[in-house]
Amino acid sequence: MDVTIQHPWFKRTLGPFYPSRLFDQFFGEGLFEYDLLPFLSSTISPYYRQSLFRTVLDSGISEVRSDRDKFVIFLDVKHFSPEDLTVKVQDDFVEIHGKHNERQDDHGYISREFHRRYRLPSNVDQSALSCSLSADGMLTFCGPKIQTGLDATHAERAIPVSREEKPTSAPSS
């Protein structure tokens, strides 16, 4: 007997007013029927709601900040350990890759993989880049900016991921 398992009512949004996005970065969290047919979910079941509020840590969305002194990337990688992550800089791009093999979780077995690529500003000092992973799974990539008259090096190199013992609070805009 096939039984459809519905997502809990408190995790549903207001249909077309706040539609879900199929390509949101939920690493292996699974798809629901409203992800595939968002326009039908509110017409088939008017009481069917998706969550209105998703925090940065729950959504896996990255945040990029670039101010006068530094360039910072925050990325939620809570399902990955530092050994599962590879961060490298090549030319004007930073590439963050995460992959872990199949492992057991509460619902069965799962494997995850992602690849993100960000363009670095031309005035970031690539020789002083750092990357750390907090206890709550927030990856922080940081690079100081140099004065505009100096030239930055653009050779490919790997950036080691260090582990922090304290959790990182969600980045605020």
UniProtKB/Swiss-Prot annotation:
Sequence positions bearing Deamidated glutamine: Q6, Q50, Q90, Q147
Binding-site residues for Zn(2+) 3, renumbered to this chain: H154
GO biological process: actin filament organization; apoptotic process involved in morphogenesis; embryonic camera-type eye morphogenesis; lens development in camera-type eye; lens fiber cell morphogenesis; microtubule-based process; mitochondrion organization; negative regulation of apoptotic process
Result after altering R21Q: In CTRCT9; decreases oligomer formation
Residues bound to Zn(2+) 1: H100, E102
Site (Susceptible to oxidation): M1, Y18, Y34, M138
Effect on the protein of changing R116H: In CTRCT9; reverse phase-high-performance liquid chromatography suggests an increased hydrophobicity of the mutant protein; loss of chaperone activity of the mutant is seen in DL-dithiothreitol-induced insulin aggregation assay; fast protein liquid chromatography purification shows that the mutant protein has increased binding affinity to lysozyme
Subcellular location: Cytoplasm; Nucleus
Stated consequence of mutating G98R: In CTRCT9; forms inclusion bodies, decreases chaperone activity, decreases protein stability at 45 degrees Celsius and increases protein aggregate formation in response to DTT in vitro
Resulting phenotype, L139P: In CTRCT9; results in protein aggregation in the cytoplasm
Transmembrane segments: none
Record bears the keyword Chaperone: yes
Residues carrying N6-acetyllysine: K70, K99
Record Gene3D superfamilies: 2.60.40.790
Domain sHSP: 52-164
InterPro entries associated with the record: A-crystallin/Hsp20_dom, Alpha-crystallin/HSP_16, Alpha-crystallin/sHSP_animal, Alpha-crystallin_N, HSP20-like_chaperone
Record annotation: effect of changing R119H: In CTRCT9; uncertain significance
Function text: Contributes to the transparency and refractive index of the lens. In its oxidized form (absence of intramolecular disulfide bond), acts as a chaperone, preventing aggregation of various proteins under a wide range of stress conditions. Required for the correct formation of lens intermediate filaments as part of a complex composed of BFSP1, BFSP2 and CRYAA.
Protein name, as recorded: Alpha-crystallin A chain
